[in-house]
Curated annotation (Swiss-Prot):
UniProt keywords, alphabetically: Kelch repeat, Repeat
Organism listed in the record: Arabidopsis thaliana
Residue ranges that the Swiss-Prot or TrEMBL entry lists as coiled coil: none
The organism's place on the tree of life at top rank: Eukaryota
Placement of Kelch repeats on the sequence: 88-142, 144-190, 191-238, 240-286, 288-336
Transmembrane segments: none
Ranges of residues in domain F-box: 48-95
Protein name: F-box/kelch-repeat protein At5g60570
Lineage of the organism: Eukaryota, Viridiplantae, Streptophyta, Embryophyta, Tracheophyta
Gene3D superfamilies named among the record's database cross-references: Kelch-type beta propeller
Annotated Gene Ontology cellular component terms: nucleus
Pfam families assigned: F-box, Kelch_1
């Protein structure tokens, strides 16, 4: 009898341990998915995410918390910190179609800032652990999925640093097959394409590469029809485009190039960007909003829209008052959902700062005037925007 009671107790303990294991934190699974033992995602019946709600419902609620608040959310307790760091909420947001736009910009060597247009909130990113050469050299930036890629130059070579919104830290990542600067770039979901630019020896490139954020690897693509530097890139209607730039120190490129991801071929579009680039000028400032292409003509401070059918540009209206740019350098012109953002310097009675202006193309233009709205102001950072990227995820 004693042996039987002891055996029953062992079975009870084993069952209890099994139940406890099935109720443990399994944050690497999506809602509704099961692990190898058939356990659904849960954070424990006795340790629920939000008291009074089943875990799946609670996780759906937390998925709507703005991503700019994740650092605060992760400080609530160890459970929330583990949930945030697992990346489960990031995946769940994608499933639910939740998109929040975050702006990353740098205005001085002190470091990067993050701005939430939705919350009108500025935040300081952790300091990038790069060397001083990279910190002070010219850089280019690109947002891919939930990563910010920063391209620059160290003492003897090009380098790429990556900031992960998920881990909230910087890491040095794999370089391109053909390292370069002054290139065209654009991103679509979890991929990005870079094309053209200049290598370490000053050679102007026609090569292009594709970056996959899921693997962190670069893949060579077919060459463009012509080499070019100081050019701009963007995705529109699911295809990648390159416009502007120079094929030699004195020759501007006026035709555009379109890359089809399915056929893996480039197509020339004659006269797509007839403006003549100069060596001292910035690359074309372009954005795509709702698959419509816009450019900021910094010589006239006018916003223009591209007519895909006529292959022509039409004037929409004027920029808001701002500090004059230096041949287009120091300005940022970026898309943000259905809005178009301009980051420019202003001087006022309280000093210098950066003003974020927005315009919705759907509102149109009235007598050449665009309805600009101020989204935010960052004071005491100078009037020059060195780099800027917008992340939507």
């Amino acid at each position: 009898m004693a042996a039987e009671e002891h055996s029953n107790k062992r079975r009870e303990v084993s069952a209890s341990a099994s139940a406890s294991a099935s109720a443990s934190v399994v944050v690497n699974l999506r809602v509704g998915e099961e692990d190898n033992d058939g356990h659904r995602l849960r954070l424990g019946s006795s340790d629920s995410v939000l008291p009074g709600l089943i875990d799946d419902v609670a996780l759906n609620c937390l998925a709507w918390v703005p991503r700019s608040d994740y650092p605060s959310l992760s400080c609530v307790n160890k459970k929330y910190n583990k949930l945030i760091n697992s990346g489960h909420l990031f995946a769940l947001r994608k499933e639910l179609g939740i998109v929040e736009y975050l702006v990353f910009m740098v205005c001085d060597p002190r470091g990067w800032l993050m701005f939430s247009p939705m919350k009108k909130k500025w935040m300081v990113l952790p300091k990038m652990p790069c060397d001083e050469c990279f910190n002070h050299a010219d850089k280019e930036s690109l947002a891919v999925d939930d990563e910010l890629l920063v391209f620059g130059r160290e003492l003897f070579q090009f380098a790429i640093w990556k900031y992960s919104l998920r881990s909230r830290c910087w890491v040095k990542c794999e370089g391109m097959h053909r390292p370069r600067c002054l290139f065209a770039s654009g991103s679509l979901g979890g991929i990005a394409i870079v094309a053209g630019g200049t290598d370490m020896n000053g050679n102007i490139l026609a090569s292009a590469e594709l970056y996959d954020s899921s693997s962190g690897r670069w893949e060579m693509l077919p060459n463009m029809h012509s080499p070019r530097r100081l050019c701009s890139g963007f995705f529109m209607d699911g295809k990648f485009y390159v416009i502007g730039g120079m094929s030699s120190p004195n020759v501007s490129v006026t035709f555009g190039e379109e890359f089809d991801l399915e056929t893996r071929k480039w197509r020339k579009i004659e006269g797509m960007y007839p403006n003549v680039n100069r060596a001292a000028q910035a690359p074309p400032l372009v954005v795509v909003v709702n698959n419509e292409l816009f450019t900021l003509e910094y010589s006239t401070n006018m916003v223009k829209k591209y007519d895909k059918v006529k292959n022509k540009w039409e004037v929409m209206g004027r920029l808001p008052p701002m500090v004059d740019s230096s041949n287009g350098w120091g300005l940022a012109f970026k898309p943000c959902g259905d809005q178009l953002l301009v980051f420019c310097g202003q001087r006022g009675p309280h000093g210098e700062g950066i003003v974020v202006n927005s315009w919705c193309p759907k509102s149109g233009a009235k007598d050449g005037n665009l309805d600009w709205k101020v989204l935010g102001v960052k004071e005491n950072v100078g009037v020059f925007v060195y780099n800027c990227a917008v992340m939507g995820c």
